[in-house]
Swiss-Prot record:
Organism: Solanum tuberosum (Potato)
Keyword Metal-binding found: yes
A Pfam match: EF-hand_6
Protein name as it appears in the record: Calcium-binding protein CAST
Domain of life: Eukaryota
UniProt biased composition (Basic and acidic residues): 1-13
InterPro entries: EF-hand-dom_pair (IPR011992), EF_Hand_1_Ca_BS (IPR018247), EF_hand_dom (IPR002048), EF_hand_pair_protein_CML-like (IPR039647)
Disordered: annotated segments: 1-31
Any one Gene Ontology molecular-function term assigned to this protein's record: calcium ion binding
Residues annotated as binding Ca(2+): D49, N51, D53, E60, D138, N140, D142, E149, D178, D180, R182, E187
Job of this protein: Not known. Probably binds 3 calcium ions.
This protein's UniProt keywords: Calcium, Metal-binding, Repeat
Domain annotation EF-hand: ranges: 36-71, 75-110, 125-160, 163-198
């Protein structure tokens, strides 16, 4: 016998798959390493929590999704948030956000994906994921990430590093090896491999 909450979750999952957000075969947003998963989710939570009250409100979640180009209906977001918070809270605490993330992983990628937990790492898939991430930053498709392109993405994500071009240029120069002021895919891969260490 299913509860009203289970019915609401099923209804929300169906509305997601009917809307703009579709299940994808890409695993770019599946975080495989459990320890990195929690760290990354915490960083995302902190970015979404604009007023730093340790809660993500419906409005904050809506703004974050819009900045990422994922236009979602406000009433659907409100329904989703209500499914994952305790009645006395006005928004998602970090623990609620983790639960929401797990449920969205189940909707989009299936709950039986072993590689979601890092059990079946696939180097070819990792390479594909890195290329996909690189392409997000390489807005003009020239095969390089310029300081301006990096700044645009950081600003869209609401990260403070994107506010000053000097800071962005320093980030680029710390990664690029041939001193041309931009990052190619191989430099990007090296950077990501030094940042993401298997647990």
């Amino acid at each position: 016998m299913g509860s009203v909450q289970d019915e609401n979750k099923d209804e929300f999952k169906q509305s997601l798959t009917r809307g703009k957000l579709k299940p994808s075969s890409s695993s770019s947003f599946r975080l495989r390493s459990p320890s990195l998963n929690s760290i990354r989710l915490r960083r995302i939570f902190d970015v979404f929590d604009r007023n730093h009250d340790c809660l993500i409100s419906v409005e904050e979640l809506s703004q974050a999704l819009n900045l990422l180009g994922l236009d979602a209906d406000l009433s659907e977001i409100e329904s989703m948030v209500k499914l994952h918070i305790k009645p006395e809270n006005t928004g998602l605490r970090f623990e609620d956000f983790e639960t929401l993330h797990r449920s969205l992983n189940d909707v989009f990628f299936g709950s039986k994906c072993e590689d979601k937990l890092g059990l079946n790492p696939d180097p070819a898939q990792d390479e594909s994921d890195l290329k996909e991430a690189f392409d997000v930053f390489d807005e003009n498709g020239d095969g390089f990430i310029s300081a301006k392109e990096l700044q645009v993405v950081l600003e869209k994500l609401g990260l403070p590093e994107g506010s000053e071009i000097d800071r962005v240029e320093m980030m680029i120069s710390s990664v690029e090896q041939d001193h041309d002021g931009r990052v190619d895919f191989f430099e990007f891969k090296d950077m990501m491999r030094t940042v993401i260490v298997p647990s």
